[in-house]
Amino acid sequence: MNFIHHIALLLLSTCGICTATETEQPAAAEAPLTMDAAIEKVQFITEKKPTPNAKYYMFFYTASWCSPCRAVMPKIIDEYAKMMADEYMEVIIISFDDTVEEALAYLQKCNSPFAAVMNNSAEPGKMPGCLTDVCSVPHIVVVDSTGKFIYRGHALRYSEWKKRTTPPPSAS
């Protein structure tokens, strides 16, 4: 399965459009892509790229014009700082802004440390496969390193995604 199909299926599943039975099965000789391998092929709009080998990947669908998005961004930045201390989670922004310039200005204004892509696949530098007419903002999708869905929902349900991705207490 090529990269565009992988990301498209990930995002279609995210939006509830398809199920595992509707997806194309990889050829026997083709190994499934890990999230690291899939993300490595994405053309980001930011200089920042995701740190490889995270346990979880959070895709945060957001936009500069969305006040709930702006309200939750500081909480996500805070949690990211805590979780990245152990390389536990990587956050990738999927911007619903109209232009790359608007997206970058928003990320700079919030001091976002995240890698970012645009939601539309029509132009270079944008994330392939997102269905903008189905997805809404703010929205979060959390997957593990194999691409298995952990959480999907509204970003303001902060406690839900945090609960599902918080590392267990270390044994002393």
Residue ranges and their predicted role:
Residues S121-R164:
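Thiol/disulfide oxidoreductase modules built on the thioredoxin-like
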Residues Y61-K75:
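Conserved redox-active cysteine motifs that mediate thiol-disulfide chemistry
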Residues M1-E40, S172:
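N-terminal targeting signals for export/organelle localization
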Residues F59-F60, E90-I94, A116-V117:
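Structural recognition of the beta-strand scaffold that forms the well-ordered cores
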Residues K55, M73-I93, Q108:
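Conserved helix-turn-beta segment immediately C-terminal to the redox Cys motif
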Residues T34-Y57:
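A short beta-strand-turn-helix
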Residues D98-S136:
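Thioredoxin-like thiol-disulfide oxidoreductase module
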